UniProtKB/Swiss-Prot annotation:
SMART domains: ANK. This is Ankyrin repeat domain-containing protein 1. SUPFAM superfamilies: Ankyrin repeat. Pfam families: Ank_2. Expressed in heart, cardiac muscle. Keywords: ANK repeat, Coiled coil, Nucleus, Repeat. May play an important role in endothelial cell activation. May act as a nuclear transcription factor that negatively regulates the expression of cardiac genes. PANTHER family: ANKYRIN REPEAT DOMAIN-CONTAINING PROTEIN 1 (PTHR24126:SF7), ANKYRIN REPEAT, PH AND SEC7 DOMAIN CONTAINING PROTEIN SECG-RELATED (PTHR24126). The keyword DNA repair does not apply. ANK repeats lie at residues 152-181, 185-214, 218-247, 251-280, 284-315. GO terms for molecular function: DNA binding; histone deacetylase binding; p53 binding; R-SMAD binding; RNA polymerase II-specific DNA-binding transcription factor binding; titin binding; transcription coactivator activity; transcription corepressor activity. GO terms for cellular component: cytoplasm; cytosol; fibrillar center; I band; myofibril; nucleoplasm; nucleus; protein-containing complex. Interacts with TTN/titin and YBX1.
């Protein structure tokens, strides 16, 4: 077996015995591979450092040019604020973008309260006040009376009317609650609805047959109560339902007397618009106009007193 030297394998030359490296590929013969490798190494040693430095500088220059071009394009693309309309458009776009980003919190509806245990009277009355319909329904479903009351003879209907809990009022009336049930001061449900300023409840009560002329212990009608408490919508509805504009309470005061005494301008205008009597006298012999003059003179006296005191204080300060 013929043994070849490494030199002969690389160069492809014949050995001393005259055997040729015929098994080598053609491009590796006659020393071409060796010469090519040597030349390649020499070229690398000469050109690599210079080329790498040059390429790095060119790359940095091109990056700077690219950045400058991008900045120029961005400046050109920016909208110019030529008028207030442009500014308003930009503000609206920013608001819209901010609105899209903000997440709307999902509010979970409270689960309906399931009542299993019996409900006593105090809890039932409190539930009517606090608008807890399941508690009220449980009490009524156990065949209890809807007209149970507290120590002041106030029923669940009175409490619900005061707070304006329409669903509970409807439920109590379906269960047979008495609309004309009177508390210790002989107020009925419509008195309590007007006291709370709940026009929707008042309308429901009147539609169900509540007496618009009902009076309490002070002989006040629901219109008296609405005027005193300043609930305009309730007073307006009562007048539309033909409530007595000139009804007198125990002191002989009409709703207009009360409106003037409490200086409720809108109520005065409402009552006068629908024909309230300006000349009717109360038990003290005073008409609504007399009360106006009395109020004006009283106010004038207060202002005169304040002016006089201010004048005296200013004279003392000068000494």
């Amino acid at each position: 077996m013929m043994v070849l030297r490494v030199e002969e394998l690389v160069t492809g030359k014949k050995n001393s015995n005259g055997a040729a490296g015929e098994f080598l590929p053609g491009e590796f013969r006659n020393g071409e591979y060796e010469a090519a490798v040597a030349l390649e190494k020499q070229e690398d040693l000469k050109t690599l450092p210079a080329n790498s430095v040059k390429q790095g500088e060119e790359q940095r220059k091109s990056e700077k040019l690219r950045e400058a071009e991008l900045k120029k394009k961005k400046l050109e693309q920016r909208s110019k604020l030529e008028n207030l309309e442009d500014l308003e458009i930009i503000v609206q776009l920013k608001k819209r973008k901010k609105y899209k980003k903000t997440k709307v919190p999902v509010v979970k509806e409270p689960e309906p309260e399931i009542m299993t245990e019996p409900v006593d009277v105090p809890r039932f009355l409190k539930a009517a006040l606090e608008n807890k319909l399941p508690v009220v329904e449980k009490f009524l479903s156990d065949k209890n009376s809807p007209d149970v009351c507290d120590e002041y003879k106030r029923t669940a209907l009175h409490r619900a009317c005061l707070e304006g809990h329409l669903a509970i009022v409807e439920k109590l009336m379906e269960a047979g609650a008495q609309i004309e049930f009177r508390d210790m001061l002989e107020s009925t449900a419509i008195h309590w609805a007007c006291r709370g300023g709940n026009a929707d409840v008042l309308k429901l009560l009147l539609n169900k047959g509540a007496k618009i002329s009902a009076r309490d212990k002070l002989l006040s009608t629901a219109l008296h109560v609405a005027v005193r408490t300043g609930h305009y919508e309730c007073a307006e509805h009562l007048i539309a339902c033909e409530a007595d504009l000139n009804a007198k309470d125990r002191e002989g005061d009409t709703p207009l007397h009360d409106a003037v005494r409490l200086n409720r301008y809108k109520m005065i205008r409402l009552l006068m618009t629908f024909g309230a009597d300006l000349k009717v006298k109360n038990c003290a012999g005073k008409t609504p106009m007399d009360l106006v003059l009395h109020w004006q003179s009283g106010t004038k006296a207060i202002f005169d007193s304040l002016k006089e005191n201010a004048y005296k204080n200013s004279r003392i300060a000068t000494f």
